[in-house]
Design a protein with these regions (language model features):
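Conserved ATPase active-site switch/coordination loops adjacent to the nucleotide-binding site
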Residues: 116
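A conserved amphipathic terminal alpha-helix motif
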Residues: 101-113
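N-terminal accessory segment detector
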Residues: 1-103, 119-127, 131-133, 138-149
Length: 149
């Protein structure tokens, strides 16, 4: 198995290559990642909704040793990535990070969340700092309101 620090750097280079081929190629790749993730998450998210999403990202937090806070209530799941291990590894590299590296998360998470009739709000905060906030809402109107903020 490839070590995660090598994997994220490889991913970064693949993203740059695909972006050079055209935006549609990059988005198609992210959609394929999303389809693959369905095998691990779709039924859990359908059956348990926000609670299932919390369970999934809580497992990821432990498995990937993420400095991440998860907050769940009846209306939304908030994932606050304090230090993203993926972007941290990409930044700790002699190759330049893809400018939109962080967009790959929304690129695979978004289509999956849409399939379970929930709504994603993604705040990258700063593309040069390994942190972001993801909020997943049950109610579309609440997600739209959050995006305005």
């Amino acid at each position: 198995m490839i070590p995660s620090d090598h994997f994220t750097r490889f991913y970064n280079e693949v993203f740059k290559f695909l972006e050079d081929q055209g935006e549609e190629h990059l988005e198609a790749y992210w959609l394929e990642i999303s389809k693959n993730q369905e095998k691990h998450t779709l039924e859990l998210f359908k059956e348990k909704g926000l609670k299932g999403m919390y369970e999934y990202w809580d497992h990821i937090r432990i498995e990937e040793n993420c400095d991440m806070d998860l907050k769940l209530d009846d209306e939304k799941l908030e994932l606050r990535m304090n230090v993203c291990p993926s972007l941290s590894k990409v930044l700790d590299n002699d190759a330049q990070p893809m400018k939109r590296y962080c967009d790959h998360c929304a690129g695979w998470i978004g289509p999956l969340i849409d399939k379970v009739d929930h709504h994603l709000v993604y705040d990258v905060i700063d593309r040069n700092k390994p942190q972001c906030v993801v909020k997943i809402f049950k109610d579309k109107e609440k997600a739209i309101e959050e995006e305005k903020n």
